[in-house]
């Protein structure tokens, strides 16, 4: 992997991980479009770590408060502060974790083609637009319950299929449940933390137990660029959220689906 490829893919991962446009679709399609070889599991690990550090740093106060109150709630056997939210994040992670263990090989082998990504990019983009268009979205973080966590968690599991977009489908589910844009987005981003930790652990195990030779230059470039781009993307996404809504991302997904159909199908 040359420096340009590592830089480009790191920036791309950081930009697309938290925007509702699917990072996996972009990381699959871009090498195919440019004729690049697969970036390798070591690079995948680096960009996962970069985006994980970005979301943890950006939401550091939330993360600290949720972790603290979750541990206190466990010790006292009653909900304290944000202890309930800690449990909702655990509940919301379980469906994707189980689906990943059961279906990841099948998804990697059979659901990474252009036709699948075209379908998921288009259909889930339209669903995001419909969810954003619906009125009466007034629910805040304080109103969340375990049923919301289960539904959003199931939606997150669907994002194992490339093109769906983890942030996109979880925000869509939140909006359909009546959450405000900010609530749906913040819950989605917080829910990303445990799932990225799990994904990073899987990649780390794969690196540690195989004969993979890690390109450390690419690893460093990918990790740093994905971190910087991800924290920037989160900031501006939330800053502009109520001004522009989800429609720029919906339109982009429709255009991207058209490009996939025209060029790769």
From Swiss-Prot:
GO terms for molecular function: undecaprenyl-diphosphatase activity. It catalyses: di-trans,octa-cis-undecaprenyl diphosphate + H2O = di-trans,octa-cis-undecaprenyl phosphate + phosphate + H(+). The keyword Transcription does not apply. It comes from Marinobacter nauticus (strain ATCC 700491 / DSM 11845 / VT8) (Marinobacter aquaeolei). Belongs to the UppP family. PANTHER family: UNDECAPRENYL-DIPHOSPHATASE. One of its GO terms (cellular component) is plasma membrane. The gene is uppP. This is Undecaprenyl-diphosphatase. InterPro entries: UppP.
């Amino acid at each position: 992997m040359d420096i340009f490829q590592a830089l480009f893919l790191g920036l791309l991962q950081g930009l697309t991980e938290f925007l509702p446009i699917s990072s996996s679709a972009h990381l699959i399609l871009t090498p195919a479009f440019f004729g690049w070889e697969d970036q390798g599991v070591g690079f995948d690990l680096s960009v996962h770590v970069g985006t994980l550090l970005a979301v943890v740093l950006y939401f550091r106060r939330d993360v600290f408060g949720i972790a603290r109150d979750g541990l206190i709630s466990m010790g006292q056997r009653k909900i304290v502060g944000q202890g309930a939210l800690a449990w909702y994040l655990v509940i919301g992670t379980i469906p994707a974790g189980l689906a990943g263990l059961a279906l990841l090989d099948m998804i990697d082998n059979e659901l990474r083609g252009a036709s699948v990504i075209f379908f998921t990019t288009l259909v889930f983009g339209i669903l995001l637009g419909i969810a954003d268009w619906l009125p009466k979205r007034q629910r805040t973080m304080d109103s969340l319950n375990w049923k919301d966590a289960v539904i959003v968690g199931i939606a997150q599991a669907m994002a194992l299929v490339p093109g769906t977009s983890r942030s996109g489908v979880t925000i869509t589910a939140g909006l359909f449940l009546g959450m405000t844009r900010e609530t749906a987005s913040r819950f989605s981003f917080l829910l990303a933390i445990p799932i990225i930790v799990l994904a990073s652990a899987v990649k780390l195990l794969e690196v540690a137990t195989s004969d993979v030779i890690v390109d450390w230059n690419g690893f460093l470039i990918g990790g740093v660029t994905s971190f910087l781009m991800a924290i920037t993307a989160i900031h501006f996404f939330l800053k502009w959220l109520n001004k522009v809504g989800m429609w720029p991302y919906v339109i982009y997904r429709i255009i991207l689906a058209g490009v996939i159909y025209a060029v790769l199908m």
